[in-house]
Amino acid sequence: MTAQNPNLAALSAAGVSVWLDDLSRDRLRSGNLQELIDTKSVVGVTTNPSIFQKALSEGHTYDAQIAELAARGADVDATIRTVTTDDVRSACDVLVPQWEDSDGVDGRVSIEVDPRLAHETEKTIQQAIELWKIVDRPNLFIKIPATKAGLPAISAVLAEGISVNVTLIFSVQRYREVMDAYLTGMEKARQAGHSLSKIHSVASFFVSRVDTEIDKRLDRIGSRQALELRGQAGVANARLAYAAYREVFEDSDRYRSLKVDGARVQRPLWASTGVKNPDYSDTLYVTELVAPHTVNTMPEKTIDAVADHGVIQGDTVTGTASDAQAVFDQLGAIGIDLTDVFAVLEEEGVRKFEASWNELLQETRAHLDTAAQ
């Protein structure tokens, strides 16, 4: 039996599920994903359009399959659908032991709906159901963005008995709406006769992008007080989100009534945890966000940083809400418009994924054209 890295094992023991924010066929074929499971405590995988775009643009791993699809006359969308769902299905199969050992809580792989549908409720619902059927694995998560149009889609998809990873959450206010959408979906699933214990969900709360946007604005203000607040907003925001999570899933009658029928909590998932500012510790968004019943999905670079020098000191979130609120009060007092910050981040988040999707379309089209020659 291969030994787990002690730092990552300590993180897991503190209640944080370690997920890898990356997937490629090379990673699957080389056994690297299995190696990360065996040595770095990885118990889940998240993907997004940027990750697939990167996977397809590097090397020739997908050439043979794309040539075969081209010969069958597959168009670009069908090709992307086949290639990405094949990888996700394979990753689901690799993670079955973790799924079984955790009673379905971990061992999860996430695939995102087409980001061009971020503002279209009905089409999002339709595609989520299609992806669920195509991958056909019980340990799949369908990723749906927490846009205004995404919220009713989240409820509708959960009501079908499908597990959902809600993505692109930036503000605590929107996170509360996400938890409400989860509870609504579970209530509908109960009415439809689904087994609630089999429906799982996580809420992906983005961390580093909040610091990137707010730090930019603090630098523009330039006062000593402003500069002292740099690098604090991302962690403070996530800590306030965790306090909101506890309110709903530990104290609300609405969740209690679902729990009696087997409903699980919707766990907070810390996303965007790769540190973008070299002035900050490269494990900042891991060591400062340790709390029970959470997930931290990390790029491999961050997993390696935690493995090498991450100091895990137990729960660093519970009981921090008043200090976190103080950070936000100070940000407001010096003129940071937080409503605008979160609106910009959501719009930018959708746009980034759309841009990656368009690059993926172009690259796949080029692959198909080459194969057809």
From Swiss-Prot:
GO molecular function, one term: transaldolase activity
GO terms for cellular component: cytoplasm
Transmembrane segments: none
Domain of life of the organism encoding this protein: Bacteria
Location relative to the cell: Cytoplasm
Disulfide bond positions: none
Keywords: Cytoplasm, Pentose shunt, Schiff base, Transferase
First-listed, main subcellular location of the protein, grouped into a coarse class: cytoplasm
InterPro entries assigned to the protein according to its UniProt record, in alphabetical order: Aldolase_TIM (IPR013785), TAL/FSA (IPR001585), Transaldolase_2 (IPR004732), Transaldolase_AS (IPR018225)
Leading EC class: transferase
Keyword Transferase: yes
EC numbers on record: 2.2.1.2
Biological processes annotated in GO: carbohydrate metabolic process; pentose-phosphate shunt
Signal peptide: none
Catalysed conversion reaction: D-sedoheptulose 7-phosphate + D-glyceraldehyde 3-phosphate = D-erythrose 4-phosphate + beta-D-fructose 6-phosphate
Pfam families: TAL_FSA
Residues of the active site: 143
Biochemical pathway: Carbohydrate degradation; pentose phosphate pathway; D-glyceraldehyde 3-phosphate and beta-D-fructose 6-phosphate from D-ribose 5-phosphate and D-xylulose 5-phosphate (non-oxidative stage): step 2/3
Gene3D superfamilies (alphabetical): Aldolase class I
The keyword Transferase appears for this protein: yes
Alphabetized NCBIfam families for the sequence: PRK03343.1, tal_mycobact
Record-stated family: Belongs to the transaldolase family. Type 2 subfamily.
Function (record text): Transaldolase is important for the balance of metabolites in the pentose-phosphate pathway.
Protein name: Transaldolase
Organism listed in the record: Mycobacterium bovis (strain ATCC BAA-935 / AF2122/97)
Gene transcribed to yield this protein: tal
